[in-house]
Amino acid sequence: MKIDVIISADYIDSEALKGKIAVVIDMLRATSVITTALYNGAKKVIPVVSVEEAFEKAKELKSLGEEVLLGGERKALKIDGFDFSNSPLEYKREIVEGKNVIMSTTNGTRALNLCSKADKVIVASVLNGQAVAKYLENEEKEIVFVNSGTNGEFSSDDFMCAGYIISELCKNKEAELTDIAKTAKYVYESSEGIEEFIKDAKHYNILKNLGLEEDLKYCSTKNLIDLVFEFKNGEIKTVESGVKVTI
C-alpha cells in the first residue's frame, strides 16, 4: 500500500486520482458535518459546489416528494435561504433523520467533487478517523489523503487529521509513505493533541473569532463515530462494507 497527501483542493489533479482511493478531509468543518449528519440518520448528503446548484437540486428532489435540508457556508457564515450553517452541532438526529442534506461549502464540497474520478472517495474527519483507518486496512490500491485546505491554501488542521489517520492505519498495515505523508504522520505523533496543535491555524482562529469554540472542540474529538462514508454518484452514504470496526 502506498499513501500520499495532497495539501489543498487547488492541488487536486482529478485525472491523476484514477485507480486510487481518495480520502477527503475538511476537518473544520465540512467533513465533520457530513459525518455527523449521516451518523444522525440523514438519508444521504449531496455535496455541490455552488449555491445555485444547491437550490436547483433541492427543487428537483422536492418535486419527487423527498424531504430536503440545505446546509453550508460562505466565509464560515450561513448562506441566505439555507436551513443550516456549517456547524455540525446543528445537524441533530431529530432534525436530519430520514432527510436528504444538500451541502455547499467554500472548501470541502469543492474538494469532494474534484475527487470524483478516483476509484473510491471516502469522507474522513477526526470524529471517525479510527473507523476510516480500520476500513482502509483492507485496501491495496494507493491511498491519497486529500486535504481541502482553506481557500486553496495549506491548512494545518486538515494536515493533522490526515496524520492522525495515517498513524492509526500504519499500526496494523505496512505502507510506503511519500515524504509528505511521513511528515503528516510525524507531526501528529509529535504533537500534544490535535486541538492544541491547530490553535494557531488561520481557519481555527476565524471560527474562534466567530464564537464557534464548541464546534472546534467537537471537530477535534477522536472516535465519536464508528462509521465510514463514501461519496459515489454525487451522493454520500454510509459504506456497507461488512468490516467490523471496534472502537
UniProtKB/Swiss-Prot annotation:
Keywords: Hydrolase, Magnesium. Pfam families: 2-ph_phosp (PF04029). It comes from the Bacteria. Coiled coil: none annotated. One of its GO terms (molecular function) is sulfopyruvate decarboxylase activity. Its EC number is 3.1.3.71. Its cofactor is Mg(2+). It catalyses: (2R)-O-phospho-3-sulfolactate + H2O = (2R)-3-sulfolactate + phosphate. The keyword Magnesium applies. InterPro entries: ComB-like, ComB-like_sf. Belongs to the ComB family. This is Probable 2-phosphosulfolactate phosphatase. It comes from Clostridium perfringens (strain ATCC 13124 / DSM 756 / JCM 1290 / NCIMB 6125 / NCTC 8237 / Type A). The gene is comB.
